[in-house]
Amino acid sequence: MTYIRVSTMTPLAGREEETSQVNQELVDFYRTQEGCVSNHFVKAADNSGEQGRISFWSSERAANEAATQERSLQLRSRLHLLVRRGHQDRSFTVAAATTDAAVGSAV
């Protein structure tokens, strides 16, 4: 079962570039971890300045193991000093009824 993590945040004023760099370092690190299917650094399409990461894992266990690695903990600690309150970390699983064919199809 695919396990998905979504992290969103808004950098503090003047810390946008550093926040982007730390997020990219996390993405690069997670891509090397066992069970990582796909990992992406994202920025909001509007002018909100929000950014984050979306990662797909082979299992919740794989995601948790990567998140508790020393490098991940260090980088995530740095992020907390760079972003506004309200940083969100969410986890999802792919719904059983979801199929690849349904993605992007017209409703």
Model-derived regions: residue spans:
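Glycine-rich beta-strand-turn "strand-cap" elements at beta-sheet edges
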Residues: 1-4, 9-10, 38-49, 75-107
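Short, surface-exposed ligand-recognition loops at beta-strand->loop->(often short) alpha-helix junctions
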Residues: 10-21
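Short, charged/polar surface micro-motifs in flexible loops or helix N-caps
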Residues: 13, 47-48, 58-63
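An amphipathic, aromatic/His-enriched active-site/gating alpha helix that lines ligand/cofactor pockets
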Residues: 25-37, 56-91
